[in-house]
Amino acid sequence: MSLIVKICGLSTPATLDVTLQGGADMVGFVFFPPSPRHLDLSRARELGAQVRGRAGKVALTVDADDATLGGIIEALRPDLLQLHGKETVARIREIKRTFGLPIMKAIGIETAGDLAALPGYAAVADRVLFDAHPPKDATRPGGLGVPFDWRLLENLAPGIPFMLSGGLTAGNVDAAVRTTRAGGVDVSSGVESAPGVKDAGMIGDFIRAARAAEINLREATSHVG
């Protein structure tokens, strides 16, 4: 199965176009006012129309209520909801029942103990996203450019679809994929020149590096034994 490459926190037509031209599989849009990447619904509608089926559209929300989710879905028409807050298993089940969209649940990782929540979330979410656990004084749950110890994921039970986030860059994505065998990689701050400011060159570099990482892992795996 091919590695999924997701560029998150896009907010301008120009950087979205670069991302689509570069061949990203998913494009992420943030709906969380404290984030420098936050979109209003008008801009979300505009950017969503620009995608035109060239990549999967992902709406990132944080503990959003049904009214907020409904407005986002109407504007963006996302293919996937990314829940990046403290949503419970019961809340995820409720969102799926109400809106009928696939869900990716973010889980913050700092220690092996943080993986205790995985079985419950994996039972209801379509995939999980492992991100670095935010510092206690953080105002946002993600997009902070902080990696975690990828070795914590080395012994995951097989069959759980997951993506990796947290401090990824063009320079470390190969090691991240090799260590975790993640099914996808998700980057935001790692392709920015300043918080919320995407850099076209960095986006292209990351996508190319992720594709190379996929090839390297496939070749390494084929040579084992």
UniProtKB/Swiss-Prot annotation:
Single GO molecular-function term? phosphoribosylanthranilate isomerase activity
| Pfam families according to UniProt | PRAI
Q: What is its EC number?
A: 5.3.1.24
Pathway it acts in? Amino-acid biosynthesis; L-tryptophan biosynthesis; L-tryptophan from chorismate: step 3/5
Alphabetical GO biological process terms: L-tryptophan biosynthetic process
Q: Which CDD domains match?
A: PRAI
User: Isomerase as a keyword?
Assistant: yes
Sorted alphabetically, the keyword list is: Amino-acid biosynthesis, Aromatic amino acid biosynthesis, Isomerase, Tryptophan biosynthesis
| KW DNA-binding (keyword) present | no
InterPro entries xrefs: Aldolase_TIM, PRAI_dom, RibuloseP-bd_barrel, TrpF_fam
Catalysed reactions, as listed in the record? N-(5-phospho-beta-D-ribosyl)anthranilate = 1-(2-carboxyphenylamino)-1-deoxy-D-ribulose 5-phosphate
Return the HAMAP family for the record.
PRAI
Q: NCBIfam families from the entry?
A: PRK01222.1-1 (NF002295)
Q: Which family does it belong to?
A: Belongs to the TrpF family.
Give the protein's recorded name. Answer: N-(5'-phosphoribosyl)anthranilate isomerase
Organism lineage reads as:
Bacteria, Pseudomonadati, Pseudomonadota, Alphaproteobacteria, Hyphomicrobiales
